[in-house]
Structures are given as C-alpha cells and as structure tokens.
Amino acid sequence: MIIYGKQIVLYVLEKHQDLIEEIFLSKEIDSKLFSRFAKLNKKIHKVDNQKAQALAKGGNHQGLILKLSDYHYTPLKDIKNMNFILVLDGLTDVGNIGAIARTAYSLGVDGMIAADIKTISNSGTIRTSAGALLDLPFAIHPRSVDLASELIDAGFTLIGATMDG
C-alpha cells in the first residue's frame, strides 16, 4: 500500500514505523528527517518527480512516499465487543470516509464499520483520515440491513441519520 504527503508520512514515522516497508524520496529533505528514516533500516529510494508522481497516482506527494504493509480490516466480531461504534452506510468517497474517521477518532469512537460498499481505497482513506484509521478499528460489511440485525442482536442501540432529512 502506498501513502504519500508530508503529514501522513510523518504520522506513520512517529506512530507506526512497523508498517513501513520502503521509503521513496523525490527531493532533498531535512537531515534530521532523513536520519529518522535511515534508522529504520528500510530501503530508501531516491526517485525523480515523474516516478514519484506515478507512485502517488498524481497526488500531492510533497516529495515523501512510503510503501506500507497491507492494511488489515478489524474482524467484525471484535468490533461487536466495543461500546461505541460508528456505521457508515454506502459511503464510498475516500475524502468523506477519512474526514469522518478523523472526527470519530477524536471523539472517542471505539470502532467504525463501512457497510454496503464493494471496494474502498485503503491508501486514500488512510491518507485522508490523517492516519486515524491506523488507530481506529475498522471493518467492512457487505449489507447494512444484515449488519443492523447483527448489531441489535449484540445488544447495540442504533441511532441513524440521513442527509435526506
């Protein structure tokens, strides 16, 4: 999984070094930051801007790109044991999911479930969440109706909101 951009790269360097597999730099960086990368004993690649743009799929990489180990979703059974969870029904936009994850994490939500989606961009969602999804348990469920039944059976009280009013 590729992530890019100064803020998320610094967050991963600070909190989740164990996830870093490779480092890609497309410009000169501060010597202190470079020494932090060097201490990880991971392969550091100096790449031109064209290669960096390809790795970041055109995103604003700011010269900093990391290859991380694969993201693993939290099993639903683990989230069902939590007290305060948030369910996102049918949301697919990585910017929206990331922003909601940041807010949920800061408000003390224990876990988050995305329901009624087929696929999600893990790297984009983690990047837009500013790393919150690396610390917030996150699961995916294929059907929101079935998920609601499972959560009620597990003792949850469901509260819903819709943008339709």
What are these regions (language model features)?
Residues 1-77:
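N-terminal positively charged helical leader segments and presequences
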Residues 81-165:
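RNA substrate-binding interface of SAM-dependent RNA methyltransferases
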